[in-house]
């Protein structure tokens, strides 16, 4: 039986796409996944170009597997994802042993690209943007667990000045409404209890319905809520510009919509937000959070921040710190600005020393982590309903589960609980996780 090894970089959308690569090759070629590249017949890198470090790591990894190709010329090596879209033929020029290069929108063509490579003896490159075609060619997912991702739209039309996504994944294109619901119903029939709706700007969803009308994201949430078997709904990543009152109202009327929201703000400075072309102010962002917390006081909030954007002053950074304290984020992802070729921001002058950017990053992380730890500590003694996801990475005798507000809870339990929703009592808090004890018997 042939085997495929897939290494994934970057976002949850890439994780979803990697699963679909495996599904496509499994259906067309009978391949199964392996965690060992040395035993693989096909090695794929699903890449990310959001930051320079992630992009360069791909080429480092390609260099490390080159000896495998030299030892086995029949080994197929492929590069997909956003670096593939951005670099195209340049990847083959830099690493001539790469056999196939494909973009996020052409992963469904992998079997044909591999066959063309074998027949022609030449590297194959397909980084076109055939919009939503790939979903028509991907076989139904077979899942092993209680949670699953469902991509509902692709691309981004916001063109933030720092971001490569519109250039690597194309503009916003939404999947048809009924197609999304059919996929979710199929997953629920396989025992999936938690659905995470995915998109670069997931709340910009505008899906065509069978009657010719257009469904917005709020309507999709309402329909997903009614799918039998679905107990939890998450979504990521959303954009503040698209966070309508209709979506806010969903938090009041849809109990399956979890009390966790990832809403990237990037900066608390209006001047920086304008330079980033984000399309909102810090006050407008805080207004969204205020409305949500009036409905869901227990809302867990996470975000993304870019530190050291060109021209960011100490005063700008202080405004970011103030926004963080005002919004009380549970956790966030903080990065030093990384200029991406081809974006407007790449040409902006940047005179802030790197050491100062590091200082700001550490200061912001300190504030965010202190608040997150305090929230974790406040959960000790409470009973939480969790979805048991996997065996703990640190202790094979422990299970790892996730609360509705996105906390990882480690507890002693039998693997037969995997994929189930159970109740646990929180017994201890740590900076990035919780400990608990199961209140549900293993045979219940």
Swiss-Prot record:
Compartment(s) of residence: Cytoplasm
Domain annotation TRAM: ranges: 377-440
Ligase is among the record's keywords: no
Residues where [4Fe-4S] cluster 2 binds: 156, 160, 163
Protein residues bound to [4Fe-4S] cluster 1: 11, 48, 82
Radical SAM core domain: residues covered: 142-374
Cofactor binding mode and count: Binds 2 [4Fe-4S] clusters. One cluster is coordinated with 3 cysteines and an exchangeable S-adenosyl-L-methionine.
Main location: cytoplasm
GO cellular component, one term: cytosol
Pfam families listed in its UniProt record: Radical_SAM, TRAM, UPF0004
Reactions this protein catalyses: N(6)-dimethylallyladenosine(37) in tRNA + (sulfur carrier)-SH + AH2 + 2 S-adenosyl-L-methionine = 2-methylsulfanyl-N(6)-dimethylallyladenosine(37) in tRNA + (sulfur carrier)-H + 5'-deoxyadenosine + L-methionine + A + S-adenosyl-L-homocysteine + 2 H(+)
Listed InterPro entries: Elp3/MiaA/NifB-like_rSAM, Methylthiotransferase, Methylthiotransferase_CS, Methylthiotransferase_N, Methylthiotransferase_N_sf, MiaB_methiolase, rSAM, rSAM_horseshoe
Coiled coil: none
Record PROSITE patterns: MTTASE_N, MTTASE_RADICAL, RADICAL_SAM, TRAM
Domain of life according to the entry: Bacteria
EC id: 2.8.4.3
Subunit structure and binding partners: Monomer.
Family stated for the protein in its record: Belongs to the methylthiotransferase family. MiaB subfamily.
Function: Catalyzes the methylthiolation of N6-(dimethylallyl)adenosine (i(6)A), leading to the formation of 2-methylthio-N6-(dimethylallyl)adenosine (ms(2)i(6)A) at position 37 in tRNAs that read codons beginning with uridine.
Name by which UniProt lists this protein: tRNA-2-methylthio-N(6)-dimethylallyladenosine synthase
Gene for this chain: miaB
């Amino acid at each position: 039986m042939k085997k495929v090894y897939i290494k994934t970089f970057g976002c949850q959308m890439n994780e979803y796409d990697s699963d679909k690569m495996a599904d496509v090759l499994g259906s067309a070629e009978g391949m199964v996944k392996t965690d060992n590249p040395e035993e693989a017949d096909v090695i794929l890198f699903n890449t990310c170009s959001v930051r320079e470090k992630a992009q360069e790591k791909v080429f480092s990894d390609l260099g490390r597997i080159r000896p495998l190709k030299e030892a086995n010329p029949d080994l197929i090596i492929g590069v997909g994802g956003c670096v593939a879209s951005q670099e195209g033929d340049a990847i083959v020029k830099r690493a001539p042993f790469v056999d196939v290069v494909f973009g996020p929108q052409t992963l469904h063509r992998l079997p044909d690209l591999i066959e063309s490579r074998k027949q022609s003896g030449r590297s194959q490159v397909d980084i076109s943007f055939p919009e939503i075609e790939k979903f028509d060619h991907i076989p139904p997912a077979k899942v092993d667990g209680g949670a699953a991702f469902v991509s509902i739209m692709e691309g981004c039309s916001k063109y933030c000045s720092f971001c490569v996504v519109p250039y690597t994944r194309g503009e916003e294109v939404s999947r048809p409404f009924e197609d999304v619901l059919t996929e979710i119903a199929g997953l629920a029939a396989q025992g999936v209890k938690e659905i995470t709706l995915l998109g670069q700007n997931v709340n910009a969803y505008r899906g065509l319905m069978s009657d010719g009308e257009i469904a917005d994201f709020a309507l999709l949430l309402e329909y997903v809520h009614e799918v039998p078997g679905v107990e939890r709904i998450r979504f990521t990543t959303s954009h503040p510009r698209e966070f309508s009152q209709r979506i806010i109202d969903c938090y009041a009327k849809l109990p399956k919509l979890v009390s966790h929201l990832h809403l990237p703000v990037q900066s608390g400075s209006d001047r920086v937000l304008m330079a980033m072309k984000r399309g909102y102010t810090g006050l407008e962002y805080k207004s969204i959070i205020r409305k949500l917390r009036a409905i869901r006081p227990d809302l867990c909030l996470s975000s993304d921040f870019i530190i050291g954007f060109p021209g960011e002053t100490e005063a700008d950074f202080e405004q970011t710190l103030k926004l963080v304290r005002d919004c009380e984020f549970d956790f966030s992802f903080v990065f030093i600005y990384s200029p991406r070729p081809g974006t407007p921001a790449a040409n902006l002058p940047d005179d802030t020393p790197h050491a100062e950017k590091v200082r700001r990053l550490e200061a912001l992380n300190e504030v965010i982590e202190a608040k997150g730890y305090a929230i974790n500590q406040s959960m000790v003694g409470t009973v939480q309903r969790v979805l048991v996801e996997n065996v703990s990475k640190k202790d094979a005798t422990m299970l790892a589960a996730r609360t509705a507000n996105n906390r990882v809870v480690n507890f002693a339990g039998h693997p037969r609980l995997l994929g189930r929703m159970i109740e646990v009592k929180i017994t201890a808090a740590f900076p990035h996780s919780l400990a608990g004890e199961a209140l549900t018997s293993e045979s219940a």
